[in-house]
Amino acid sequence: MAKILLVYATMSGNTEAMADLIEKGLQEALAEVDRFEAMDIDDAQLFTDYDHVIMGTYTWGDGDLPDEFLDLVEDMEEIDFSGKTCAVFGSGDTAYEFFCGAVDTLEAKIKERGGDIVLPSVKIENNPEGEEEEELINFGRQFAKKSGCAV
């Protein structure tokens, strides 16, 4: 069975909490998941090993990608995402002008490289709570189904 690559960047733990919930949903659907923090990926060629990719990020400053994702996104220029099912999630703060702008940047990069975004991106204010937790678990379940990785 094909595995799903789950990659995320976190600073305060909010995006990691989101990744935990998404992974829970994926596992409930019996999908196999390989999970990495963006800063631990030395080579974007890792993406070529997967047909299904979920990426999550927090937003830094005025809607920017965090440093942990900059090199990875730059290296994605060399990767063909055609035929890959993808989804994006992230945390942010509405106090800033561009709420979760880094999520939009990642989604645009995946589309530019030919990836198929199969679910609307999930954007959460700070740490997921209450109904947001169930939304993220469902996001994982839905991605597993849309990618054909659910059992």
From Swiss-Prot:
One Pfam family cited in the UniProt record for this chain: Flavodoxin_1
Requisite cofactors: FMN
GO molecular function, one term: electron transfer activity
Superkingdom per UniProt: Bacteria
Residue intervals of the Flavodoxin-like domain: 4-144
Keyword terms of this UniProt record: Electron transport, Flavoprotein, FMN, Transport
InterPro entries named among the record's database cross-references: Flav_short (IPR010087), Flavdoxin-like (IPR001094), Flavodoxin (IPR050619), Flavodoxin/NO_synth (IPR008254), Flavodoxin_CS (IPR001226), Flavoprotein-like_sf (IPR029039)
Known function: Low-potential electron donor to a number of redox enzymes.
Family of the protein in this entry: Belongs to the flavodoxin family.
Identification of the protein by name: Probable flavodoxin 2
Organism whose genome encodes this protein: Bacillus subtilis (strain 168)
Gene: ykuP
